[in-house]
Structures are given as structure tokens and as C-alpha cells.
Amino acid sequence: GYTFQFISYTSLFSGSSIDEGTLLLIENIKLPGDGLILDIGCGYGVIGVVAAKLNPKLRVYMTDINPLAVKTARQNARLNRVEDRVVVLEGDRYEPVKGLLFNAIYSNPPLSAGMKIVEDIVLGARDHLSRNGFAQFVLAKGGEYLEREARKTYSIVEATSRKGYILLYLKP
């Protein structure tokens, strides 16, 4: 197995411990063999750091709009010795990675930011995936609605319900 260490701040989402949704995603994470992946709305970097550690062939991009989250995600990449293959960028949604295509995109999107932003992240992933790329999202509230919307946008939609969350696996 692997051991991970994370520092956080109580002002960040789930700052005192890793939340159930993120745990559900990392316990069920599907990783491509290589290439670029994205952890969008990364917070203090749990998903991206775990992915980087599990597969050293991946180049991991992480984005967040919160400067403290970006700084902390960088610290956590260093702490877990994956900083050589992790890039953490500050910015809104997909803006910091414009023009890049990813083999996989992951997120536990920030419901506190509102459904519009969550919808942009989930439905917008399609435009940022490589030809054989896929996305995995974990959603609490609004999961059923977004699952229905995703079925209009993606050719493959797998939804797993667990502990009040919906884990979505999406392929264009």
C-alpha cells in the first residue's frame, strides 16, 4: 500500500479531514496508463497527489480558484514527493488549462460555489478530454440532475450511488 501525508487549513473545504466524497472517488479512481490528467477544483490536492503517486507515468495538473488551496496543493505534492510531475495552477474552472487535452479529469466539485459552476465543470469536461479520455466526478446534492444532463452530452455514463454520493464515470 501507499502512505500519504497532507497538510491543510480549516478555511479550506474539508480542511480538518478528507471528506467522504473525495474518499469515495480515490477508492474507486480509474487511472490512464500515462499522459496528462486534471484535478479541477483541487482544494489541498488530495485527488491529484494520490493519482501522481499511484502512477508515476502521469503528468498531473491541478487547478483551484483559491490561492491558499493552490499553495497548499503545491506543499502536499512536495510532501508526498510527486512535485516533479505535478503542476498546480490558480484560476477559475478550465481557464488555467485552456488548450490542453487530458486523458482523465477528476473532481469533487464545490457545491458551495453553486450548481452553475458544478455543471460547467461536469459538462465542460468533454471539451478538455483527449480522444480516449474519461472523467470521474463525485457529487452529493444535485447528482441525479447532473447524471441526467451528462447523458445528453456523453456517450458513456456510469453512475454508482454510495453513502449519499453519486460517482460518475463519463466518456465522450
Task: Tell me what each language-model feature is.
Residues G1-P32:
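Class I SAM-dependent transferase core
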Residues I7, Y61, V87-L89, V157-T160:
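General small-molecule cofactor/ligand-binding pocket signal
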Residues E20-K98, A104-S107:
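Conserved SAM/SAH cofactor-binding pocket of Class I
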Residues N103-K116:
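A short SAM/SAH-binding and catalytic strip from SAM-dependent methyltransferases
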Residues L111-A113, A140-Y145:
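Short "lid" loop at the C-terminus of a central beta-strand within the Rossmann-like core
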Residues E119-R131:
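A short glycine-rich, Lys/Arg-flanked "PGG" loop and its adjoining helix->strand segment in the class I
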Residues N132-L139:
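Conserved beta-strand signature within the Rossmann-like core of class I S-adenosyl-L-methionine
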Residues G143-P172:
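Active-site capping/gating segments
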